[in-house]
Amino acid sequence: MLYNVVENDWGELTYVPTMLGNILLVVLILALLGLSLFFAKKHSKKLTVKQLVFCAMSIALGTVLSNIKLFHFPTGGSVTLLSMLLVCLPGYWFGLGVGLLTGVAYGILQMLIDPYILFPAQLVIDYLLAFGALGLSGAFAEANTQNKLKNNLFTILLGYMFAMLSGLFFFTNHIDSESSLNYNILFGVLFAALYAAAIIIGFMVKDNLVKAYILAVAGRYVFAVLSGWIFFGSYAWDGWGALPYSLVYNAIYIFAEAAVTVVILLLPPVRKTMTQIKNLALSD
């Protein structure tokens, strides 16, 4: 048995991994980090052991910082101390494939440490897709700077199709069947529009790390909105629909952390330090 169904303090039935389930999650994390070695083939050479250690350290530090909460909503969602930035760094350093796998590995670790699973499909979107989207920072990896426009357009298209198809396969039972395709097309448009806005803002900023971070945070926000809309609409404030509630609720904590992080990243001493760390990560 990989999980138990237990009742939490609010009377909700949640899925909690058993010991075997936790072991499997750890194995998955290690496997994903190992797969990063193969995705690095798009670069001039494979990831070295040192670079793989940098990925693991980013996950570990991101996990530690995720527990330093500057603000926490009672119903979920927190403004943490730079935790999303730490998860974005491997993608920015080593490319899109490595970034996505690192983000998913981080999501699995979060599920291992603090699971909050009401539906199996929610596990996919809240832990795998939302945190995996932080790896989209790889669209601005140094190796991709010569093809930024091509990579960003591909990211928008990929994100749109992924959001629409994930909704069709996983969440149509929560929406009227006759309108499920229309809902997912509309959500895909929202996904693509938000990514386009993030990219436009990113091009206005000279710092590539800030661009990468904005794009990655936008990706996480989209999946957080989808989860809130479908699974947590019953928590909506009086007079609010599920989708507007999810849009505002998730924006409050995700973009608040993003704003604090961007301000910190633009400080000259921090920019210099981040450049030195990147050079160290990419050095032979």
What are the residue ranges of the model-derived segments?
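Loop-helix junctions at membrane interfaces
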Residues: M1-D284
